[in-house]
Amino acid sequence: MLTIAKMGAHSVAYYQSTVDENRGPDSYYSEDGKQPASVWLRGEKLSEVSAFLGTDNGAIVSGKTVENWFNKAVAPSGAGLGNAPRKDSVPGFDLTFCAPKSVSLLWGMGADSAVRGIVDEAHQAAVSQALDYLSEHAGYTRKQVKEPAGKRLVVEKLAGISGVKYEHRTSRAGDPHVHSHVLLANKQLCRDGKVRTLDGVSLYHEARAAGMVYQATVREILSQKLGVEFGDVVNGCAEIVGLDDPELIASYSTRAREIDQWQAENGLETRAAYERIAQKITRRTKDTDTPLDELETEWARAEHGAQVREFVAGLEPKNEADARESSEDFLPKPSQILAEVAAERSTFTRADVAEKVAELIRPGAISPEDMTVTVEGLVDAALAAHGTWSVTPEKSRELDSTQREGSQKYTTVEVVDEVERGVDMATARVERGVTAESIQPVEGELSPAQADAMRAVVGSDYLASVVVAPAGAGKTSSLKSAHHAWNMAGKHVIGLAPTGKAADVMVGENVA
């Protein structure tokens, strides 16, 4: 899972507050969050980015260096990165990569075996693959170029993307929680040698696809090296079979329970938008002083601790020679990819296809280090397949440099055919309307325009009728009268809505 949050002026101080800078990169997690930040770099012009910043991929950096880089716009090399961010501006983005809870439990209970190291390896490799993907598809900036007709704002590929990474293995509540805070600097080196801000729109557009690449890589490595099997993928995340019991997962997910409880107590459990508010309100200060061995004892003594420990003890880590051979028979075909994508959305972007491809790749299909390359190839094959149409060909970046990757949308022949069938059905006359004589008046008042509209809808001989009016014009309340008229004529009314919120309004207005 990948979540993205904008950093603020105090973000660096928070991550650095738990770091012990006397520890090297190999002094691993005796207390969570103590490991110093490490540099990460990605991009086609990696050597140029490295030389400009004065640091290398994987280098350990001090808190002062991170502070200067993000909050004072000074690179590790001492090079200026433009004006320092204001207190209310965004110095960077926190890309948080989180392993599935069952994977975190392997790490938490795997101290006495090679399991913990394999989980760490899988997580790090998965983050690396996801950053490779983001570098290719979210590594953009915007700049003005002078042309005969005037200035034009174009979207241009960066030389690379860069930042620092903090490793954490527990949640704020002290549960096993393998995750990395990958801080992406807002100011990046461009191909012309200048420094500009990252295009945040492109970053957010590619977040789900990158998160899927991360999850697919984790599944690939753990299935090959530990022999575990994963259950169904739900929203890009799959739990390990044997550790996927909902009660077990919930028992080691204290933060999730706290958030759910706060939402329920405040009557907000049906509104996903309130989850971020709940996260902030219920947030506690993270305990980084409890030694890891004490936490391990608590995890083992928990209600499901014996079950998890028994599962971990039964794993037999495999070496390179024992790992299963990859098989391309496990890779999804273009027709399957397109069918799965089109089942969820009528039009889609390249990122939508990448998201689905990563979800469909079964463990054992490829070598983990080839995940991003494989996803790219399958996406290209699906978009080039017969029956894939570009809905907005004029927005291709090959034709218009002002467009982002996400500007171009696609669909399939099957979707177009379905739309045409829908139009044919909607415009067909079926003579099933309610006659004017049978329409009974109802209590309450409608404006003349509302009454005329509902009379036309109820008495229509077409399979579909459309009511067009601005927000607040009374469309929903007017439909209450139509609902009553249909019921009086012996017809059963079923209400459908595109979103849960809209459905709630229909129920509240007694329309459905």
Predicted regions mapped to residue ranges:
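ASCE P-loop NTPase motor cores of helicases and related translocases
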Residues: G267-R271, I277-T349, A358-A512
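Intrinsically disordered, flexible peripheral segments
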Residues: M1-A342, T349-A358, T374-E376, D380, ...
